[in-house]
């Protein structure tokens, strides 16, 4: 059952556009599980890290994340997922990131 394509395949989670999830880059840590995130729609949001992610996944400045904006306050949101550097580079190489947040683009 060897498949040569499995070695080179990287599977990454993408935002669910139907539920309003978008890409974002963490700009600043605000403390108390809060972050300032620049989102792909050009809005800077004050996002929080949900309790189930706090201890499991550490988030730093410059990380690529998936944000779900709040329905009742558009300037706030929740962090859904954090990409590793390898996953972020993969998304950038395959042009899956919007230009506004593609800071992983390697100039060649």
UniProtKB/Swiss-Prot annotation:
Spans through the membrane: none
Domain annotation S1-like: ranges: 10-84
CDD domains assigned to the protein according to its UniProt record, in alphabetical order: S1_IF1A
Coiled coil regions in record: none
SUPFAM superfamilies: Nucleic acid-binding proteins (SSF50249)
PROSITE patterns hit by this protein: IF1A, S1_IF1_TYPE
Protein name listed in UniProt: Translation initiation factor 1A
Organism: Picrophilus torridus (strain ATCC 700027 / DSM 9790 / JCM 10055 / NBRC 100828 / KAW 2/3)
């Amino acid at each position: 059952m060897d498949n040569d394509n499995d070695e080179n395949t990287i599977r990454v989670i993408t935002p669910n556009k139907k539920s309003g999830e978008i890409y974002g880059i963490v700009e600043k840590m605000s403390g108390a599980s809060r972050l300032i995130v620049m989102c792909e729609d050009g809005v800077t949001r004050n996002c929080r890290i949900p309790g189930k992610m706090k201890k499991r996944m550490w988030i730093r400045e410059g990380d690529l994340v998936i944000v779900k904006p709040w329905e009742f306050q558009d300037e706030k949101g929740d962090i859904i997922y954090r990409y590793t550097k390898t996953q972020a580079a993969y998304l950038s190489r395959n042009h899956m990131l919007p230009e506004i947040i593609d800071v992983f683009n390697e100039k060649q």
